[in-house]
């Protein structure tokens, strides 16, 4: 990909540039979810619902918390590098690249060790059923032993996307998915390692993707190049990255904590409900990967145009992206609800678990379009450096409100009364984020 092609984000037809960038991210997210889903399908069908709950229940929420935090922080690198790239500031691009990589290495090592040490305590705190504790601890510990690979890949992919390269992260995820599927079949079906086999397969696949993205950055000559000897934290760049990334990281933590609290309530309904929730989280991800791809696309688009000083493209690009995100959200809701029984049947063959999953989908799926407002507007605001208020809206309007709802309802509520916290908090967050976005854009464009 040449420099001229990358600059199409600041010069080309807006809807085309958004879609050119969007589709590789979407397909990449699909393959990333594919190897996670393959774990769940193979474990659920060939090991059992208890093993499925061990892989995707409380263990999955813990993993999401840590990985989500770092992914949030990595958006700081995406925004900073995209702005420098749009402004054609080569020295700043190089410094921010090496700072981001150093942060990924240190973060992966420190949090990986912490996860291994504290896995039992975290799972017990989440009211994980006693019969699931041993395998859940095993899965979490193996996963966290390779956390550094996950951090390296996520940061490297974020850097490539920041400069407009969304294709190579896709290619690496395809390779990673193939490796994971082959190892799943080997370590679960041929060598019956159960949950351990699923964890090892994921770890090795993530290591492969980390190596591939690192080699790409080392030998990339257009725009930037990673030199291992220059990996260090430049204070100025670290401050800039963390100024944007930390609020996003804490936002991700709040999402995860609120989801963990929901998971604790789900656990109280028993193993069948836990298995249904795990399966639903895999089906539900179809929406999240599409929505997230729009969020990443608008963040990179706005970031580069912000660096280039093209304010009208920022406004028009955000509107176009929102329209596409809303159409996609409604379409996904209709498709998932039309095929709900078939989709749950892919993961489990227990009729009771399938019925519980259908109840979950009928509550949550109709409200997907609400989150499109939150994803697109927060991405556009973050790309312009406006992170504090948008993060507070998410943390309070969605996460804190969700925790309060579940805490008040969980003791005596039905399953539907617990999980309706998602549509309620999305509605509150969408309204608040839309109001703030309109207010902030008026101020920015009046000042310009």
What do these predicted ranges mean?
Residues 74, 142-161, 169-177, 198-213, ...:
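Short runs within selected transmembrane alpha-helices of multi-pass transporters and secretion channels
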Residues 52-113, 150-169, 276-340, 371-394:
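Small-residue-rich hydrophobic transmembrane alpha-helices
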Residues 1-22, 81-146, 190-246, 302-367, ...:
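Short alpha-helical transmembrane segments in multi-pass integral membrane proteins
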Residues 34-53, 123-130, 186-195, 253-282, ...:
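Helix-terminus/linker motif at the lipid-water interface of multi-pass membrane proteins
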Residues 20-39, 142, 153, 176, ...:
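Transmembrane helical elements of multi-pass membrane transporters/channels
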Residues 47-61, 136, 140, 199, ...:
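Small-residue hotspots at the loop-to-helix junctions and early N-terminal turns
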Residues 11, 15-34, 38, 62-69, ...:
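Residue-level signal for short hydrophobic patches within transmembrane helices
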């Amino acid at each position: 990909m040449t420099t001229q092609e990358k600059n199409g984000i600041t010069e080309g037809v807006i809807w085309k540039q958004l879609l050119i960038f969007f589709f590789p991210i979407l397909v990449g997210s699909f393959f990333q979810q594919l190897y996670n889903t393959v774990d769940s399908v193979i474990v659920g069908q060939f090991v059992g619902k208890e093993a499925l709950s061990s892989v995707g229940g409380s263990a999955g929420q813990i993993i999401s918390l840590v990985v989500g935090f770092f992914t949030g922080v990595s958006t700081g690198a995406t925004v900073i590098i995209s702005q420098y790239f749009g402004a054609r500031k080569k020295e700043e691009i190089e410094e921010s690249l090496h700072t981001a990589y150093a942060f990924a290495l240190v973060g992966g090592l420190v949090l990986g060790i912490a996860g291994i040490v504290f896995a039992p305590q975290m799972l017990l705190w989440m009211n994980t059923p006693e019969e699931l504790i041993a395998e859940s601890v095993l899965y979490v510990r193996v996963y966290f032993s390779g956390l550094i690979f996950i951090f390296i890949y996520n940061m490297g992919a974020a850097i490539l996307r920041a400069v407009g390269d969304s294709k190579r992260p896709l290619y690496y995820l395809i390779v990673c998915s193939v490796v994971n599927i082959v190892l799943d079949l080997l370590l679960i079906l041929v060598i019956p390692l159960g949950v351990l086999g699923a964890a090892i397969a994921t770890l090795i696949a993530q290591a492969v993707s980390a190596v591939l993205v690192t080699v790409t950055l080392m030998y990339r000559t257009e725009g930037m190049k990673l030199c291992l000897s220059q990996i260090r934290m430049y204070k100025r760049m670290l401050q800039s990255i963390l100024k944007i990334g930390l609020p996003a990281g804490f936002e991700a933590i709040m999402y995860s904590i609120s989801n963990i609290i929901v998971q604790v309530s789900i656990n109280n309904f028993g193993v069948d409900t836990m298995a249904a929730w795990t399966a639903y989280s895999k089906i539900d991800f179809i929406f999240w990967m599409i929505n997230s791809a729009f969020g990443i696309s608008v963040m990179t688009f706005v970031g580069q145009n912000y660096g280039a000083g093209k304010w009208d493209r920022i406004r028009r690009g955000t509107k176009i992206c929102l329209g596409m995100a809303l159409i996609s959200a409604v379409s996904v809701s209709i498709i998932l609800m039309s095929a709900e029984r078939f989709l749950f049947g892919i993961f489990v063959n227990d009729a009771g678990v399938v019925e519980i999953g259908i109840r979950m989908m009928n509550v949550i799926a109709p409200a997907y379009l609400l989150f499109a407002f939150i994803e697109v507007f927060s991405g556009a605001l973050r790309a312009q450096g406006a992170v504090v208020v948008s993060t507070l809206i998410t943390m309070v309007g969605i996460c804190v409100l969700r925790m309060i709802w579940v805490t008040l309802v969980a003791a005596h509520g039905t399953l539907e009364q617990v999980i309706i916290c998602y549509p309620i908090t999305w509605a509150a967050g969408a309204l608040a984020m839309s109001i703030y976005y309109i207010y902030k854009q008026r101020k920015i464009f009046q000042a310009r």
